[in-house]
Each structure stands twice: as structure tokens, then as C-alpha cells.
């Protein structure tokens, strides 16, 4: 048995972390298996090249065994010496937390790799303490499906509603189940009957559940391509938050240039998207947010309203043409009162009711009441927007709108704000931060990140 060694490989620009070879015992088929710990970045790059063996590589890491030095070349990423493909085979059977498992077996001159899947699971409804990161079986793409390695999955306030059993679309689900509302991933397996995609393609989908994972399967006919060169975390912010904003503006409200629009929660992910896209549509914008976020609201071209100290119902004489409200303070009554004659309230959430511990039935009654307000005098209207309901009614719109947003991102016209990129083991804490509020931008899960390392903001 060999002492643990830390080996620093070449990773080019990625500068991935250190490999750790914990044990090396190898030889013939009757010898113990090889145990090697390899970090996620190295694994994924190795996967793309199928870990081709190359004994001519200059990037060798050698250990002392009969004076020999042998190597595996993993796409010029790293080499762990001592593995002779002609006489030995190994299997990674013991790894520390946060490391991917590789099963390395003899297959001619090409080892076979099996990745490790980890997921964020809801074990019971309630607080973030009910979230657990667990090992899960590696999914296999079925007919009409692809398997993706998850590059990014947005963390939404909606996730906290699902966890607390307050989200109508998942009301029938019971723990345990996997969290994750949306996904940007790289295809690494094609199911039977899938055409138009190939290994390595980057794709996106809104899944509602199941995407806080290292790997997952997706229906190929639901996927939207992610343009080359687009940052995966930024792309993930578009799938729910920016799609909600885009469809609120152009599908639900059908806004017109010059309209006066109030955005509640203007500093949040959806609020920021509404301000940016609303500005591009030529709207006059006001953003309700905490006073500490006034500068951010101005940055997006809107007039800030400190909702803690200013009455937005009296802020604009005559009232607003459109109000977007994802908070639902007092059951949307004040937002409705802030409209002018003929104005439209577009509600799309009820975070205030959640914070006040309201029951789901109460919040559903708030939504139902919106549709009765159109009979009140004053010509004002109200409606509730659901991204899932609109996708169900108009599936072509979803792909069309997401492709348009991806094109804007690829062209540099929009710059979604990623507040922080987090690891699987930090998801529970991320839920607490989402519930506390005050974030300027989106938290995005990047499964390749390790807990405890310095996180990267966009």
C-alpha cells in the first residue's frame, strides 16, 4: 500500500484542483483494485475524451514501482502512473465527499468510466433541514430521451414553496423526490430514437423537479439548444426568471411602448429581468424594492420606490397602466388599487403569503379572486400568470421565447446577474438565503463546485 500522494496535474486555463491518489495496489487480475480520487473537473474532461491511454505524454506523474513510470493521459489533464492497461484493471471504490467516482476497467487500450450521481433530495416537507445530498443511481436515457451532465440549475424562490408543500403544480408529490426547477446540461448519452442531437451538445429545459443533480434524463423533444460560448450559469437564469419576465411582458400583458409600469420585487431575479426587458420594450418603469436596493433599480433604468417607507398606490398620479406583482401583499389589493382606469394587474406569485405562513388554500383563493375583480367598476383588470400553464397551452411559445432570450444573451444584449454559484452541499443554505430575501440576482447550482471553496459571482 502506498502513502497518499497529492499530484498537481496540467489543466490549461481551467486550473482544476489537485488529484489525490489514496491507494495504489495493482498488478494482475487477482490483485486488489486500484483506488484513485479524481476531482470533478478532471473527470468531466476525461469523460469527453474517454480517458485515452497515451504513454508518450510529457505530463506524467510517476510513483516508484520497480523503477518504472507509466501514465494515463486524460486529455492533457492529469496522469496517475502505475496503471498498465495490458496487465491490470482497477475500480475506484473509495472516494472522499464531493469527488466523482470513476470505474476504470481494462477495455483494450481504452478504460471504461462510470460517473457518480449525486442529487438534492427532499426527505420531508418543511424547513431546509429536510434537504439532503445523497448518492443516486445513474439514470439511463430511454426511448426519446437524452442524459445530460448538469452544468447549472437555477435556485428559485419557487423551490422553497415546493419544499414547503405550497406549490400547486407539485401538490401531489410526496417525499422523497429530487429538487431542481430548471437545467442547463451537456448531453452524454442518447436514447433510442433520438435524432437532431449529438454527444456534447448543450441543452436547456424547465423541469420543475429533478435537476439539482449531477446527471438526469430529459425528453429530447422538449429541449432548447444553448448557443456556444454562453455561460451555463447565466443561461440557467433565463429559463424560469427571465422567461417569466419575458412572457409577462409580451404574452400576458402585451405591453405597448410608453406604458407606465410598476414592478414589485424589482431587485429580485424576475424583477431585474422585467426592468431590463421592459426598458428594451420602451416602457416607463418604476421598481418597488427595499431602500438599500434603490441604486440597483436605477441601474436598470427605473425609478425606485422604497416600499417600506413610500406608498406606491399614491406615487403616480392617475395610476399605472400595468402592475407586475409576484409578492401578493394583502392579497394583491393595493396593487389593484394602484392601477389607472383600464389598467392591468399581472400577478405571478405570492411570496408574502408564504412568509406569513398562509395555507395553500388561502393563497389559491387570492388567485381566484383576481378574476372576479374585472367586474368591479373602473375598468381595471387582473389575471394570474403561470409559466407552466402557459407552456401547457402554448408549447411552441416556450421554445420560441427561450431561443429569443438565448440569442439576446449570446449577442451581449442582456447580462443576467448571477449572485453566486453554489455547490450541491450548499443548497439547503441557499434555500435559507432565498427565504430571507435581499439577494441581488440569482443563486445558481453548479454541481462541479465543491463546498467550502471560494464561490464565483458573475
Residue ranges and their predicted role:
Residues 242-309:
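Mid-domain Rossmann-like dinucleotide-binding core that forms the NAD(H)/NADP(H) cofactor-binding site
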Residues 1-7, 36-38, 47, 59-73, ...:
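Hydrophobic helix segments
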Residues 198, 229-231, 254-259:
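Short helix-loop-beta connector
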Residues 184-208:
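A glycine-/small-residue-rich N-terminal strand-loop-strand element
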Residues 114, 406-421, 428-458:
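C-terminal capping/lid region of NAD(P)-dependent oxidoreductase domains
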Residues 127-128, 136-184:
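N-terminal glycine-rich beta->alpha transition that marks the start or flank
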Residues 315-322:
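A short acidic, Gly/Pro-enriched loop at the edge of an enzyme's catalytic core
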Residues 330-411, 447-458:
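Glycine-rich phosphate-binding loop and adjacent beta-alpha segment
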Amino acid at each position: 500500500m502506498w502513502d497518499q500522494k497529492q499530484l498537481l496535474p496540467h489543466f490549461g486555463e481551467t486550473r482544476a484542483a489537485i488529484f489525490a491518489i489514496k491507494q495504489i495496489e495493482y498488478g494482475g487480475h487477482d490483485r486488489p483494485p486500484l483506488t484513485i480520487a479524481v476531482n470533478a473537473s478532471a473527470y468531466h474532461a476525461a469523460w469527453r475524451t474517454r480517458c485515452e491511454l497515451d504513454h508518450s505524454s510529457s505530463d506524467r506523474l510517476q510513483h516508484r514501482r520497480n523503477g518504472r513510470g507509466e501514465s494515463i493521459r486524460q486529455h492533457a489533464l492529469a496522469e496517475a502512473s502505475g496503471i498498465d492497461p495490458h496487465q491490470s484493471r482497477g475500480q475506484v471504490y473509495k472516494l472522499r465527499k464531493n469527488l466523482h467516482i470513476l470505474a476504470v476497467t481494462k477495455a483494450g487500450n481504452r478504460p471504461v468510466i462510470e460517473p457518480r450521481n449525486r442529487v438534492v433530495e427532499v426527505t420531508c416537507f418543511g424547513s431546509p433541514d429536510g434537504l439532503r445530498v445523497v448518492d443516486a443511481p445513474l439514470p439511463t436515457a430511454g426511448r426519446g430521451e437524452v442524459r445530460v451532465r448538469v452544468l447549472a440549475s437555477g435556485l428559485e424562490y419557487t423551490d422553497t414553496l415546493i419544499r414547503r408543500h405550497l406549490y400547486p403544480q407539485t401538490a401531489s408529490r410526496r417525499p422523497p423526490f429530487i429538487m431542481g426547477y430548471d437545467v442547463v446540461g451537456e448531453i452524454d448519452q442518447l436514447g433510442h430514437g433520438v435524432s437532431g442531437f449529438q454527444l456534447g451538445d448543450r441543452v436547456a429545459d424547465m423541469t420543475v423537479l429533478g435537476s439539482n443533480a449531477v446527471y438526469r434524463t430529459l425528453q429530447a423533444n422538449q429541449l432548447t439548444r444553448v448557443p456556444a460560448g454562453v455561460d451555463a450559469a447565466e443561461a440557467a437564469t433565463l429559463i424560469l426568471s427571465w422567461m417569466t419576465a419575458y412572457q409577462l411582458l409580451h404574452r400576458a400583458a402585451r405591453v405597448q411602448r410608453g406604458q407606465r409600469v410598476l414592478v414589485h420585487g424589482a431587485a429580485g431575479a424576475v424583477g431585474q429581468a422585467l426592468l431590463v426587458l421592459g426598458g428594451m420594450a420602451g416602457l416607463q418603469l418604476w421598481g418597488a424594492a427595499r431602500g438599500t436596493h434603490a441604486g440597483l433599480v436605477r441601474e436598470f433604468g427605473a425609478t425606485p420606490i422604497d416600499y417600506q417607507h413610500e406608498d406606491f398606490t399614491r406615487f403616480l398620479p392617475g395610476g399605472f397602466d400595468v402592475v407586475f406583482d409576484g409578492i401578493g401583499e394583502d392579497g394583491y389589493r393595493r396593487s389593484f388599487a394602484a392601477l389607472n382606469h383600464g389598467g392591468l394587474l399581472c400577478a405571478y406569485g405570492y411570496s408574502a403569503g408564504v412568509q406569513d405562513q398562509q395555507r395553500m388554500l388561502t393563497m389559491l383563493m387570492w388567485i381566484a379572486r383576481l378574476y372576479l375583480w374585472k367586474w368591479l367598476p373602473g375598468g381595471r383588470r387582473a389575471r394570474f400568470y403561470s409559466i407552466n400553464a402557459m407552456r401547457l397551452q402554448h408549447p411552441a411559445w416556450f421554445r420560441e421565447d427561450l431561443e429569443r432570450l438565448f440569442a439576446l444573451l449570446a449577442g451581449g444584449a442582456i447580462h443576467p446577474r448571477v449572485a453566486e454559484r453554489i455547490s450541491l452541499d450548499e443548497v439547503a443554505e441557499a434555500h435559507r438565503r432565498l427565504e430571507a430575501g435581499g439577494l441581488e440576482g440569482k443563486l445558481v447550482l453548479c454541481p462541479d463546485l465543491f463546498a467550502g471553496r471560494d464561490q464565483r459571482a458573475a
